[in-house]
């Protein structure tokens, strides 16, 4: 049998978790239609507290990723199609299949499919272990 004081702590902790979860969900912007990021692999690195995440971003014609940031370096390679890469403070750049780019941590950016075909980009992210790969920005 659980003691009443322990039971109160458990109920309070559960309630706090639910309230915090609702707050996070309410603040998240809606998902971008026509954009999908599929994880390929995730592994710890030799540097303590760091991990690498690889994912394929698929951007349908006319769609975009939406403005977002990453907590670490993004090293990306365009597998298929063409994208327009918009990085805050820089002119937009066109990246075609076979081209690569690097985005520094915390940099606000957006990728748009260009050229009327699906664009697929392989992203490699070096991040602190347990952090989300991407954070949407309004």
What name fits each language-model region?
Residues 32-67, 124:
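A short glycine-rich, His/Asp/Glu-containing loop-to-beta-strand
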Residues 70-90, 99, 129:
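Glycine- and acidic-residue-biased ligand/ion/polar-headgroup-sensing regions
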Residues 11-21:
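Bacterial N-terminal signal peptides
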Residues 22-29:
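Sec/Tat signal peptide C-region and signal peptidase I cleavage site
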Residues 59-60, 89-106:
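Short acidic-glycine-tyrosine-enriched beta hairpin
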Residues 2-13:
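Bacterial N-terminal signal peptides that target proteins for export
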Residues 73, 92, 106-132:
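Ligand-binding loop in jelly-roll beta-barrel domains
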């Amino acid at each position: 049998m659980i003691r009443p004081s322990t039971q109160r702590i458990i109920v309070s902790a559960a309630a706090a978790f639910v309230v915090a979860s609702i707050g996070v969900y309410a603040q998240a912007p809606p998902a971008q239609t026509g954009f999908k990021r599929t994880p390929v692999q995730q592994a710890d690195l030799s540097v303590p507290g760091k991990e690498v995440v690889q994912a394929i971003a698929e951007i349908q014609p006319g769609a975009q990723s939406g403005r977002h940031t990453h907590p670490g370096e993004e090293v990306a390679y365009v597998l298929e199609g063409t994208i327009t890469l918009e990085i805050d403070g820089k002119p937009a750049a066109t990246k075609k299949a076979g081209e690569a780019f690097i985005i520094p941590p915390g940099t606000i950016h957006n990728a748009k499919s260009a050229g009327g075909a699906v664009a697929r980009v392989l992203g490699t992210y070096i991040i602190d272990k347990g952090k989300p790969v991407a954070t949407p920005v309004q």
